[in-house]
Regions:
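Terminal RNA-binding accessory module
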Residues: 164-266
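Conserved SAM/AdoMet-binding glycine-rich loop
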Residues: 1-133, 144
């Protein structure tokens, strides 16, 4: 089960109405309101044998209550998609993002203090208008600090109707965008390879999602950290929870051998 939203951490249910009007609600409505960490816990308790994910979290709204709820329940995946967009405060301000580099890094530290091996993924926009080489280096250094498990990286392009598209000239040459994007991707691949290598030899609980694209003799699924795991099909099928011993890896995929069926509570 995936709890999905553009910004799931801003979820607040108090019987109906907009979040901005919460202070106008009755005392009873406010006292019985449900925020995202509470919703996540309710779902985890209701479906103990169902794997639960959520996405996406915005850094300014991500609370440590959510992280503590993740840590408390084995059926909540230990992965947070936490878009940062840039490692430069100057560019973040130009993007109208509501977090700074320092606030983001502090959030990462706090997440890992609660769940040390929590997988963290990112979105990154490269070549935003007026991005300097120093801004680009700030992005690379942030990536080295966080060491993301995986990410989604794109070069900037004008989008009609956006504030940037209306007010900022797309003034970074495409060749320079491509160069910087390649450097960002290289850093991400290095960190992804490190994370997958660290899982070799471990036993992972894998939820089978389908047949491997490379061979019908293999199945693929994801572990508790949202990493793709491929293993021989044998008698297992889509929807099974399988204990898989990881024997090898690529930069983005874990390879293994099935041991047995398993349960999230085991």
């Amino acid at each position: 089960m995936t709890l999905l939203g553009q910004n799931v951490d801003s979820y607040l249910w108090y019987g109906g109405g907009l979040k901005k009007d919460f202070n106008k609600a009755t005392q009873m409505a406010q006292a019985t309101a449900v925020n995202f960490s509470q919703l996540l816990e309710k779902v985890a308790l209701k479906f103990p044998e169902m794997r639960i994910r959520f996405s996406t979290s915005n850094p300014q709204d991500m609370t440590l209550d959510v992280v503590r709820t993740m840590a408390a329940h084995s059926n909540i995946c230990k992965h947070i998609h936490l878009p940062v967009q840039s490692g430069s405060n100057r560019i973040l301000k130009a993007m109208n993002r509501q977090h700074t580099r320092e606030e983001y890094m502090a959030l990462i530290d706090n997440i890992r203090a609660i769940i040390p091996d929590c997988a963290i993924s990112q979105d990154m926009i490269i070549g935003f208008p007026n991005e300097t080489e120093e801004d680009h280096k700030d992005t690379l250094s942030l990536m080295e600090y966080v060491k993301y498990d995986f990410g989604y990286m794109y070069s900037y392009s004008d989008r009609p109707g956006t504030a940037a598209g209306k007010n900022l000239a797309d003034n970074i040459p495409e060749t320079l965008k491509s160069k910087r994007l390649a450097e960002v991707i290289a850093v991400q691949r290095k960190h992804a390879a490190m994370h997958t290598q660290n899982r070799v030899g471990k036993i992972e609980t894998v939820l089978v999602e389908g047949v491997s694209k490379k061979s019908e003799k293999d199945l693929m699924g994801r572990n508790n950290y949202n990493a793709v795991v491929v293993f021989p099909r044998e008698t297992y099928k889509i929807g099974d929870l399988v204990a898989v011993k990881i024997t090898d890896c690529t930069s983005g995929t874990l390879l293994g051998k099935a041991i047995s069926h398993t349960k999230l509570s085991s």
